């Protein structure tokens, strides 16, 4: 039976819309509040985006059939600068972006012309994404829809950000951030090409050496190793810059001079000096006045750090091998240098770098094995190493603690200062500019570095359900390394800081507790509540149970009945029972979601569950415009049907694995669904009568399938559950057909009708449109989505028949 997928989907979407079953209000049933990260509308969604939303929809539909009152809402995240950068690129007629809009996303030319206005871009793709979600069959309560720039939501964000500031979670100060020099704004994942979160390594420092009237600032991650320095490395092919940095004279690479302009220093270029003019001379270590020779090394990259490197050959494999290479050439200065051991580590002798280079068979300083040697030795010394007697007052300190003590000592004496770097450079802003690290002064930060706040978040993670459970360690690692994060910027769409209107709340700070706004957004949308009614006292009373109803009534100018209705709605639906998102948001949004909930709400309102999924590949390759393998979701729906796409995404991988989407699997799923629809069309409900042994067996096996699928869906092992419904059970049906045929029976339609009713009901959350069509063919008048999820019945399992059939099979 060949299916017209789009016709069937349109038919059932109209019936769902008419029935209003997905419009959820409080009632006497137990509730499930399921949310998924709202999309940023700067492009249409493609098949990869469809995975997260499809998984969440299966979850919502499953619990609805289990008798829960399920709220599954959706909003749209307009906040930030991406559409601003996009509008600038369109205005300057950038070929790459225009080609993508025309040839990949098929945006009409008349719409592209309006895209010089950022809001037009967001509005266009908002409607495009929403249409795609409806066409995919997502069971969303659209009455609660909002964007993050509507006045009601902005009132909510003003309250949220004020509450955080009043509790000391927002501070003002100086801190390094990822920065776009063109837009003059901090950047985060939503602002960069490829959605890359700029990772700042703020453990990098400059150690200062004296060179005549100049300072040689040298970057290091290991300040404790200054006691083992034997020489400095300079690239003979680099021309360095003489600069004035505030009141000090420095020699650094040209690339470094540009970087430190963003550190709040006043920089003046005074001239050039060739690397060859420096090599062979001596610098002075400020901490002990030791004369340090300067040697040549072509491995020194001017773009990394300051373009100058300090050498600790006893403990740095790269330094050791570079020194050995020079010694092999009978280099006069190098021949006088011997490694100075300053760390003792169990399992290593006096010169650990020498040992590990020899063990790994490193040949010279270009050997790629040096990277592995470095990582292995650095980790071992950090965890197990102790500083020796050459380290003065720091003797016997463990490296992991002594490092910070040496750092603080050097900093107190002005021998060291911070030099934050972009760990995952190059990162490009959506406007096309390469991002840098900037030290912002008088910036507003969320103080995610606060240890007490971190510990509360850890407690929340310990008590919540995280699927799959192995992702829990990633969350804890994020909490460990998180530090102050800029929560405002001076450009972009969004909500202004209530106390400083020059700043706008940034996109990863206004998207952390918005799930609470879903519980009241329908009242704002139908104008029961106006934005001006949303006062601080209103939010305090509804969301925090602070103050009293009379204060909320007097400040909001709302009736007590309306206030009571909104409060009951919030108290009924909160907390969030399950939060769905992709793995790429673990390091920011999902962690911030937990941190902000524990900062604002009482414990009983903390999130109950987080579900994290992997991404989607196309025929084994990452989806990208450059590879030409991006398929917009709506295009795929038109070409293949929503349900085949849903099932292809689900069946290709378990939760955290990257799903590999391919047309072969879509075609196979289409055939399977067509076959099942035809089978359902030929079955009629009829009296079953006395059960034979094979009937008892197949009905028992059906109960086993119910138990397995139910457990799989509860644990979000959807691939496994779908496999059981569509494929694994087929072998049981084939055996049953053989047994029936062997006995010459032709009256088993009633049993097959019962079994397939069970299968179709369980298929409904996965492939809702075709399941409704099958359900109708089976003779049911109610919607499949309103049917009850099949319950496992132990009484319906006949152990004797199972044993008998297994004996027959064998």
Segments predicted by a language model, with ranges:
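Protease-associated
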Residues: 223-308
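Short, solvent-exposed turn/loop segments enriched in Gly/Ser/Thr/Pro and often Arg
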Residues: 28-30, 38, 73-82, 145-153, ...
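Structured, non-catalytic alpha/beta "coupling" segments that mediate domain-domain communication
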Residues: 71, 223-261, 408-448, 666-680, ...
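N-terminal catalytic cores of NTP/NDP-binding nucleotidyl/phosphoryl-transfer enzymes
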Residues: 24-88, 148, 157, 218-221, ...
């Amino acid at each position: 039976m060949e299916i017209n997928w789009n016709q069937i989907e349109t038919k059932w979407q109209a019936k769902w819309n008419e029935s209003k079953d997905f419009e959820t209000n409080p009632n006497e049933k137990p509730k499930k509040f399921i949310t998924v990260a709202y999309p940023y509308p700067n492009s249409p969604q493609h098949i990869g985006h469809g995975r997260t939303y499809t998984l969440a929809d299966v979850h919502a539909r499953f619990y609805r059939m289990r008798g829960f009152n399920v709220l599954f809402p959706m909003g749209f995240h307009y906040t930030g600068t991406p559409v601003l950068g996009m509008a600038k690129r369109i205005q300057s007629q950038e070929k790459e972006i225009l080609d993508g809009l025309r040839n990949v996303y098929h945006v009409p030319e008349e719409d592209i012309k309006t895209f010089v206005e950022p809001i037009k871009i967001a509005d266009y793709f908002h409607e495009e994404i929403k249409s795609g979600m409806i066409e995919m069959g997502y069971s969303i309560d659209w009455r609660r829809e909002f964007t993050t720039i509507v006045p009601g939501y902005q009132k909510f964000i003003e309250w949220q950000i004020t509450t955080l500031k009043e509790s000391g979670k927002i501070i003002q100060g100086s801190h390094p951030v990822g920065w776009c020099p063109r837009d003059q704004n901090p950047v985060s994942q939503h602002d960069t090409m490829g959605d890359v979160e700029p990772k700042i390594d703020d453990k990098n420092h400059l150690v200062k050496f004296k060179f005549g009237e100049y300072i040689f600032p040298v970057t290091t991650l290991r300040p404790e190793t200054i006691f083992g320095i034997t020489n400095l490395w300079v690239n003979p092919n680099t021309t360095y810059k003489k600069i004035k940095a505030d009141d000090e004279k420095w020699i650094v690479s040209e690339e470094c001079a540009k970087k430190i302009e963003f550190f709040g220093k006043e920089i003046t270029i005074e001239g050039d000096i060739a690397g060859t003019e420096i090599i062979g001379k001596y610098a002075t270590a400020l901490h002990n006045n030791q004369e340090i020779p300067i040697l040549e090394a072509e491995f020194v990259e001017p773009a990394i750090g300051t373009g100058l490197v300090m050498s600790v050959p006893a403990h740095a494999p790269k330094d050791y091998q570079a020194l050995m290479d020079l010694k092999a050439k009978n280099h006069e200065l190098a021949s006088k240098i011997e490694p100075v051991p300053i760390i003792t580590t169990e399992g290593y002798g006096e010169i650990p770098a020498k040992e590990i280079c020899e063990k790994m068979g490193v040949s010279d300083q270009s050997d790629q094995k040096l990277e592995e040697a470095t990582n292995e030795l650095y980790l071992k010394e950090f965890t197990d190493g102790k500083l020796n007697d050459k380290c003065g007052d720091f003797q016997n300190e463990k490296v992991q603690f002594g490092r910070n003590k040496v750092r603080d000592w050097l900093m107190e004496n002005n021998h060291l200062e911070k030099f934050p770097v972009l760990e995952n450079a190059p990162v490009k802003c959506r406007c096309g500019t390469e991002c840098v690290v900037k030290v912002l002064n008088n910036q507003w930060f969320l103080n995610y570095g606060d240890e007490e706040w971190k510990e509360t978040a850890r407690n929340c993670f310990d008590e919540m359900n995280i699927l799959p459970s192995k992702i829990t360690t990633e969350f804890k690692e994020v909490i460990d390394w998180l530090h102050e994060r800029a929560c405002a910027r001076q450009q972009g769409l969004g909500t202004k800081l209530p106390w400083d209107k020059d700043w706008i709340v940034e996109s990863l700070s206004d998207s952390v507790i918005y799930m609470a706004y879903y519980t009241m957004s329908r009242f704002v949308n139908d104008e029961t509540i106006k934005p001006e009614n949303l006062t601080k006292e209103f939010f305090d009373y509804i969301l925090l149970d602070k103050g009293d109803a009379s204060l909320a009534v007097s400040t909001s100018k709302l009736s007590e009945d309306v206030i009571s209705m909104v409060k009951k709605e919030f108290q009924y639906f909160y907390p969030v029972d399950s939060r769905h998102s992709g793995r790429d948001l673990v390091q920011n949004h999902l962690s911030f979601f937990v941190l902000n909930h524990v900062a604002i709400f009482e414990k009983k309102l903390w999130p109950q569950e987080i579900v994290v999924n992997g991404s989607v590949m196309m025929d084994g390759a990452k989806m990208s415009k450059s590879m030409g393998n991006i398929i917009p979701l709506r295009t795929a729906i038109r070409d293949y049907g929503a349900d085949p796409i849903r099932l292809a995404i689900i069946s290709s991988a378990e939760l955290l694995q990257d799903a590999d989407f391919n047309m072969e699997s879509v075609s196979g799923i289409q055939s399977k669904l067509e076959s099942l629809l035809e089978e359902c069309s030929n079955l009629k409900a009829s009296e079953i009568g006395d059960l034979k042994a094979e009937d008892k067996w197949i009905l028992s096996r059906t109960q086993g399938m119910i138990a397995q699928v139910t457990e799989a869906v509860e644990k979000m092992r959807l691939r496994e559950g779908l496999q059981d419904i569509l494929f694994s059970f087929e072998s049981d049906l084939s055996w049953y057909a053989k047994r029936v045929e062997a006995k010459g029976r032709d009256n088993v339609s009633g049993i097959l009708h019962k079994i397939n009713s069970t299968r179709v009901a369980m298929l409904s959350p996965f492939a809702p449109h075709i399941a409704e069509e099958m359900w109708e063919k089976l003779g049911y008048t109610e919607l499949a989505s309103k049917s009850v999820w099949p319950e496992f019945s132990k009484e319906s399992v006949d152990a004797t028949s199972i044993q008998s059939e297994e004996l027959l099979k064998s």
